[in-house]
Amino acid sequence: MSDNDTIVAQATPPGRGGVGILRISGFKAREVAETVLGKLPKPRYADYLPFKDADGSVLDQGIALWFPGPNSFTGEDVLELQGHGGPVILDLLLKRILTIPGLRIARPGEFSERAFLYDKLDLAQAEAIADLIDASSEQAARSALNSLQGAFSARVNHLVEALTHLRIYVEAAIDFPDEEIDFLSDGKIEAQLNDVIADLDAVRAEARQGSLLREGMKVVIAGRPNAGKSSLLNALAGREAAIVTDIAGTTRDVLREHIHIDGMPLHIIDTAGLREASDEVERIGIERAWQEIEQADRVLFMVDGTTTDAVDPAEIWPEFIARLPAKLPITVVRNKADITGETLGMSEVNGHALIRLSARTGEGVEVLRNHLKQSMGFDTNMEGGFLARRRHLQALEQAAEHLQQGKAQLLGAWAGELLAEELRLAQQNLSEITGEFTSDDLLGRIFSSFCIGK
C-alpha cells in the first residue's frame, strides 16, 4: 500500500436506493472535503451540505461526515458523503472526486485492509466484516458480530500468551541446566502443556461449529439401493430433485442440493446405492459415493425398515460402518415407517441418533430437519460463539499437531530444544489467524473477497 494513495468507493450496494454513500480514505480526504463541499466539516458531526462539481454547480446535496485519523475506521482521514441513491448521481459525484490528483478507486476490501494495517482490526476481525455481510441466518450473523467484536481473537490471543509463558519456562530449563530443579522432568512443563492442549481443543471444537455456521454442513445420504435415499433428498429439498423409481440403482451419480433450514445452510448429497456394482457406470457412481462420504460432515445412513428390524448400524451393515472415517457422525434413518408401522420420532442407539420416518409421505422429516439444525449448533446456546473459516481450522489443526509432537519430544527424550521449536511453530500457526504473523500473499487473497467499499 502506497502512503500517497487516497482511495474512494461506493459503500452502498449498486443500483437505486434511498441513500448512496461514497467513502474516501487517505491523506487527501481533507482536500476532497474542501474541494467538493467548500469546507471541512466538524469532526464526527453530520453536516448537511451541497456536493459541488468543478464549475461550482451542485451535483447533489446530503450528509457529510468527517473522521480525522487516527480516530477513524481505517486509521486514516476518512470522509463519507451520503447523498441520494441514484446510480447516475453517484457516478457523477465519483467522477468529480476522481478528478482530484492522487485519488483512485479502492480495491475490494481495501478499506478493511487499511484498518488491519493501521492496527484498528486484527485479521480475524477484518474477515468477520465480510462474514457478517454474507451471514445467511440470525445465528451466523450473531456469531460473525462476536468475531468482529473480538471473541475469536481473544481466545486465540489467550492461547498465544499461554504458549509464550510456556516457551519462557522451557527456554529457562534449557539455558540453566545446572539449577537444582530439573524443569523438564519435574512435571510442571508437562502439566502446563496439557492445559494449553486442552484449551486449544476447546477452541478447535468451537471453530468447527463456527465453520459449519459460515459454510454450511455437508450431509451425505448413503445406504443400499432402494432404501429411499432419493425420496429423502426430495423431501428435504421440497421439490423433485431426484428421479425416484422402484428399480434398484436408479441413482448412478452424485446429486447435490443446497438448502436452508431456518436460514442454516446445508449441502445435501444423494449418492448411488452401495453394493457390488453390476456394470462400469454403476461402479464409478459407487466410487464417487465413497469419495463424498469421506469428505462429509455427517452421514445419513438410510435403512429400508421393511428389510430389517435392527437399529444398531453395526448390526445392520457392519462392513459399511467399518469403512467409514473415524469420528464421522452418523444418523441412522429408518425409512418406510408408513409401511412398517414404527413409531415416528428420534431416539439414540449406541451413541448414534436414530430417526424413524417416511420419506415418501414426509412423516417424520421435520424431526430430521430439527436434528440437522441441532447438529449444526442452531439450538444450542452460542451467545459467545464465533464464525471461523477453513484457514482458521487449518491453523488450529497445525498448532495442535505441533503441540502433540512437542509433548512426544518431552515425554520420550526430555528434548527441551525440540519442544521449544514445536512450541514456536504452534505459536506461529496461531498468530496467522489474527495476522500477527502472515504473508502479503495471504492478505491479498483474504481482502480480495470483500466488497469494494469495505
From Swiss-Prot:
InterPro entries cross-referenced by the UniProt entry: G_TrmE, GTP-bd, GTP-bd_TrmE_N, GTPase_MnmE, MnmE_dom2, MnmE_helical, P-loop_NTPase, Small_GTP-bd
SUPFAM superfamilies the record matches: P-loop containing nucleoside triphosphate hydrolases, TrmE connector domain
Source taxon at top rank: Bacteria
NCBIfam families named in the record: mnmE_trmE_thdF (TIGR00450), PRK05291.1-3 (NF003661), small_GTP (TIGR00231)
Species name: Escherichia coli O139:H28 (strain E24377A / ETEC)
Purpose: Exhibits a very high intrinsic GTPase hydrolysis rate. Involved in the addition of a carboxymethylaminomethyl (cmnm) group at the wobble position (U34) of certain tRNAs, forming tRNA-cmnm(5)s(2)U34.
Cofactor: K(+)
Name of the protein: tRNA modification GTPase MnmE
Subunit structure: Homodimer. Heterotetramer of two MnmE and two MnmG subunits.
HAMAP family: GTPase_MnmE
UniProt KW keywords: Cytoplasm, GTP-binding, Hydrolase, Magnesium, Metal-binding, Nucleotide-binding, Potassium, tRNA processing
Keyword Cytoplasm tagged: yes
A Gene Ontology term for the protein's cellular component: cytosol
EC number of the protein: 3.6.-.-
Binding annotation for (6S)-5-formyl-5,6,7,8-tetrahydrofolate: 23, 80, 120, 454
GO molecular function, one term: metal ion binding
Enzyme class: hydrolase
Cell compartments where the protein resides: Cytoplasm
